[in-house]
Amino acid sequence: MSGKKILIVGASGLVGTAAVKLFAGQPDWDVVAVSRRAPFVPLGKATHIPVDLLNADQCREVFGAMGDVTHIAYCAVNEQEGNMVAGWQDPVQAGKNMAMLRNLFDPLIAVAKDFRHISLVHGLKAYGSHIWDRVMPIPFKESLPRIPHENFYYHQEDYVSAKQAGQDWSWTIFRPAMIAGDAVGSNMNSYLVLAIFAALRKEAGLPLPQPTGASMVTDVADADLIARGLEWATEAPKARNDSFNIMNGDVFSLHDAFPIVADSLKMELGAKEDFQIIPELEKLLHLWPGMVRKYGLRAPENLKELFGESLEVGGAWTAPIAPTDVVRYGLASTIKIRQAGFHHCIDTADMIRKYMRRYQELGVIPPVA
């Protein structure tokens, strides 16, 4: 035993998947991955335990027996099926997410006598980025006051802060924007939506069109980079009991992704068109089951298993944006985390190329001929 055992919660999601890969690849960590379904990517040396975090009895049985856990990377979130965006301000949905954390942590902290740290992955909704009629500050900074509204991020932060008072262990909260990763079936993987759309267009013999109009300019967060942040927080003194924005380090115009994807998949880049990506993708979805069989893909034929609720956020690639709004919703300062000692970064264009390659390597989309 290394003496360091991390519980990665929400292991089948974007950040959880990346965290499992990172920690399981290191010799000094024992890794337990927790999620209702197994991660799509190989687990390596990690052990997967299927748990429903809303089942308090199951959680008491499972986590009450984990006295050797020293660290937690909490990446889990429960989204409202069928109307994910509406759920972001729903008190019932907030209550579910608070219950999930409590169901896990209460029994675990009672038995984990060498517990050292918990990280929680939140996001820019901590600043009200999902409340569309607000005037947004630019950039979002960790010092901004809370927005009076129903937000489980606040409940979870207050909970771990109260639990930690007077204890030797510590907590860290991360706030990324628009996460990119290689999880399949995740609820927030807009990059998978774009990749599948491009693959369908290529299979149909069609070019990848480019959106017209103004493009949102936003921060992006690579799930692999967030996993590095989770690793950093396990040991960094300046990460203790604090919150940090975490981003790639540049800003990105969403429409610029289309030529990058076309080049990555060796397909024709079309002209600029007035279109919406989700309706156009749905017109071609009848091709998908045949593509899975034709190319021997590991990706599921079932659309719910493939996308989760990601189609709801995937429309952002072509969403009409008023020119005055292009920088309103997704720009955050990363000065605080840099000054605290975390300096990892990645060019977002390179990140997109990486995931287009990785989707092929994992058998999510057809390989480039």
Predicted features by range, described:
Residues 229-320, 325, 330-335, 339, ...:
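Mid/C-terminal beta-alpha module of Rossmann-like enzyme folds, strongest
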Residues 196-221, 245:
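A conserved pocket-lining segment of Rossmann-fold NAD(P)-dependent short-chain dehydrogenase/reductase
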Residues 122, 159-188:
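Conserved beta-loop-beta element that borders a ligand/cofactor-binding pocket
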Residues 167, 179-196, 224, 232-244:
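Glycine/proline-rich active-site loop of Rossmann-fold NAD(P)-dependent oxidoreductases
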Residues 145-149, 177-190, 211-224, 250:
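Glycine-rich "substrate-gating" loop/helix at the edge of Rossmann-like oxidoreductase active sites
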Residues 39-103:
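NAD(P)H-binding glycine-rich loop region in Rossmannoid oxidoreductase-like domains
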Residues 3-27:
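N-terminal Rossmann NAD(P)H-binding glycine-rich loop of SDR-like oxidoreductase domains
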Residues 72-74, 85-152, 172:
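Conserved Rossmann-fold NAD(P)-dependent oxidoreductase catalytic core, especially the SDR/UDP-sugar
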